[in-house]
UniProtKB/Swiss-Prot annotation:
Name of encoding gene: hslU
Keyword Heme belongs to the record: no
PANTHER family: ATP-DEPENDENT CLP PROTEASE ATP-BINDING SUBUNIT CLPX-LIKE, MITOCHONDRIAL-RELATED (PTHR48102), ATP-DEPENDENT PROTEASE ATPASE SUBUNIT HSLU (PTHR48102:SF3)
One biological process term in Gene Ontology: proteolysis involved in protein catabolic process
Name the record gives this protein: ATP-dependent protease ATPase subunit HslU
InterPro entries, alphabetized: AAA+_ATPase (IPR003593), ATP-dep_Clp_protease_ClpX (IPR050052), ATPase_AAA_core (IPR003959), Clp_ATPase_C (IPR019489), HslU (IPR004491), P-loop_NTPase (IPR027417)
Annotated GO CC locations: HslUV protease complex
Phylogenetic classification of the source organism: Bacteria, Pseudomonadati, Pseudomonadota, Alphaproteobacteria, Hyphomicrobiales
Matches recorded under CDD domains: RecA-like_HslU
HAMAP family with a match to the protein in the record: HslU (MF_00249)
């Protein structure tokens, strides 16, 4: 797990997300506390529980983006889910325990990837031997093998096509037992059963020598790794370092005066309670305790309020962070300052057609103004509004770019207003088009 300081985490998030200092600080402290807990010993380590977070803020201000960037930073198993995807246990649909099963799968992939790095050198040599077997046969003399090995290492054989046998890891469907909630633990995974019975299934693939290396290195790495050890390590990592991000939590809050329980509302909240508090979930790899998994939840709370959540669930989300709506200055900074800003993306896309785009300062002001106006008059969708506006402005250039190779387009305020001004003024039209 990464041991960035809170200040480093915030500055890393600043590269991609504008504003929202409070939310960044909250997740940075939460992430650092995971590392601090790892440094403790014995009983105290068991007692320290993560402080779960509830992010509240309008759509398009960076709630989900903060979680995505945090996952990359953490180097820890991370799963993002929408609360609306789940139904109460006993109904058709996914139950909330599936979140933890997904987390374990992600942890296994993470641990396997790390372990593969440790055995990469040995796996590379084994892969080379298998390529030689495919080129000259297993019975070839050592002299022949050596001469081909030299050619291989010089890259002379890169384009030659060979047939290789690799283990077949194609996902075969799990049998699900109707009427049994949680039966999709993977009770009877037929490929596992067949694989063990027949000593591992393989399939033949045709590929060039150059392309065969990554496939064979992965295959050989897996042979060198102890799969049981990987699973045990992944279960430990899931329990100690796992982060679960639950989006749209406001959509499962019962609205005041609303009637009907709603299969995917209060029931889902009740099912989430033990998960967030700490329980043991059965997975096909073994039981996973959720006591030390960090839960970050977020919601826009346009219609409902955080107090509409079950009181017990509110109590289990002790850290509340409010994200502010974006201002005109924020829109300007989103267009220019972020690492892969929209303007940089469009310039890069057009360069593939040998078309040069230049944006003047007043164009950026105009784009920000239009986005703010539309958010105020139509519907506030935050930073996502910029994508709509940019697409509309660059529609003509994007369409004709292949015929205009070598051309340079300078986009200024006049151009922006010409393309979008009329629509922005006519509120009825902009409701449909922007």
């Amino acid at each position: 797990m990464s041991n960035f300081s809170p200040r480093e985490i915030v500055s890393e998030l600043d590269r991609f997300i504008i504003g929202q200092k409070d939310a960044k600080r909250a997740v940075a402290i939460a992430l650092r506390n995971r590392w601090r807990r790892q440094q403790l010993e014995g009983q105290m380590r068991e007692e320290v529980m993560p402080k779960n977070i509830l992010m509240i803020g309008p759509t398009g201000v960076g709630k989900t983006e903060i979680s995505r960037r945090l996952a990359k930073l953490a180097g820890a198993p991370f799963v993002k889910v929408e609360a609306t995807k789940f139904t109460e246990v006993g109904y058709v649909g996914r139950d909330v325990e599936q979140i933890i099963r997904d987390l374990v799968e992600i942890a296994i992939a993470l641990v396997r990837e790390k372990r593969r790095e440790d055995v990469k050198a040995k796996a590379h040599l084994n892969a080379e031997e298998r390529v030689l077997d495919a080129l000259v046969g297993k019975t070839a003399s050592p002299v022949t093998r050596d001469s081909f090995r030299k050619k291989l290492r010089n890259g002379e054989m890169d384009d030659k096509e060979i047939e290789i046998e690799v283990s077949d890891s194609g996902a075969s469907p799990n049998f699900e037992i109707p009427g049994m909630p949680g039966a999709n633990i993977g009770v009877l995974n037929i490929s596992d059963m067949l694989g063990k019975a027949m000593g591992g299934r393989t399939k033949t693939r045709k590929t060039t020598v150059k392309d065969s290396y990554p496939i064979l290195i992965n295959d050989e790495s897996d042979k060198l790794l102890d799969q049981d050890q990987i699973v045990q390590e992944a279960l430990r990592v899931s329990e100690d370092e796992g982060i679960v991000f639950i989006d749209e939590i406001d959509k499962i809050a019962a609205r005041e005066g609303g009637s009907g329980a709603g299969v995917s509302r209060e029931g889902v909240q009740r099912d989430l309670l033990p998960l967030v508090e700490g329980t043991t979930v059965a997975t096909k790899y073994g039981p996973v305790k959720t006591d030390h998994i960090l839960f970050i939840t977020s919601g826009a709370f346009h219609v409902s309020k955080p107090s509409d959540l079950l009181p017990e669930l509110q109590g289990r989300l002790p850290i509340r962070v409010e994200l502010s709506a974006l201002t005109r200055e924020d829109f300007r900074r989103i267009l220019t300052e972020t690492e892969a800003s929209l303007i940089k993306q469009y310039i890069a896309l057009m360069e593939t057609e040998e078309v040069k785009l230049e944006f003047s300062d007043d164009a950026i002001d105009a784009l920000a103004d239009i986005a703010v106006d539309l958010n105020a008059t139509v519907e506030n969708i935050g930073a996502r509004r910029l994508q709509t506006v940019m697409e509309k402005v660059l529609d003509e250039i994007s369409f004709t770019a292949p015929d205009k190779a070598g051309a340079t387009f300078i986009i200024d305020a006049a151009y922006v207003k010409e393309k979008i001004g009329g629509l922005a003024k006519n509120t009825d039209l902009s409701r449909f088009i922007l």
